[in-house]
Amino acid sequence: PVKNFFFGNVKAHCDRIGKICDATKFSMKDVRIESCDTVMRIDNCDYASFFGFSNVTTGSSVKIEKTGGECRYLNVQTYPLVPVNYQSIRPGEVWLDTEGKPIQAHGFQVTFREGKYYWYGEDKTHTLFGTNRMFGGVRCYSSTDFYNWKDEGRIIEPATDPHSPLHHCQKLERPHILYCAKTGRYVCWLKSQSNDGHFVILEAEHFMGPYHFVRNLKPNGFAVGDFDMYADPDTGKGYVWFERPHWEQICAELSDDYTNVNG
């Protein structure tokens, strides 16, 4: 049987994609069908997962049928793919951007600047668990009312160089961006879980990037876990609080340019 088979970003003019039979694990993501009745039939699959299936002509969801053998796990998530305009926050629902796509900003931060909210976080659109494809960059959204969020694109891109600390195989999480008044630059810290825990530090002239790698950092030689950051608006001093995993919480003062710590 087929194992760990994945389709992504499929565009097709068809009545159906076909039938999947005897697959150990089968996933399809972000599928845009323009004309469809029954799109998919699945038979005797241990695990089948379908994310973002939609008919782009009508904005409606598409039809998936189970036939024959048992499917032990079936997960289907469909989205309208039409513009949305929220009047409130809807707990328990998948939050969509203004184009009708699921918001991809995990492990996020929200900041307010120049009359807009900016929500940025990990882009998991193409993350495939069970593979080495983990880091999809950092995506940013903007809003004036905190309900409706416009996709501004990725402000940090995953690297294609396998030796880069930003390569898609790296386990990078929880981006934090501070503005450093002394340098006039934006500094981004990410937590890396690859190998031992450390920070990956980037810098940019503009909040929306492009960001450039500065250094990897283990403050005072400590491995790092979850963290938070703060810049004091009165003194201009920056601080990082981080977990020494399963051991203790540590606070360190940042260097003047926010790209290191002062002991």
Model-derived regions, located:
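Surface-exposed loop/turn segments connecting beta-strands in extracellular beta-rich domains
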Residues: 10-15, 34-37, 56-61, 76-81
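Carbohydrate-active catalytic/glycan-binding domains of CAZyme proteins
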Residues: 79-263
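Short intrinsically disordered, low-complexity coil segments enriched in acidic
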Residues: 1-13, 82-85
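All-beta strand scaffolds that present successive hydrophobic residues in beta-strands
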Residues: 2-7, 26-30, 48-53, 71-76
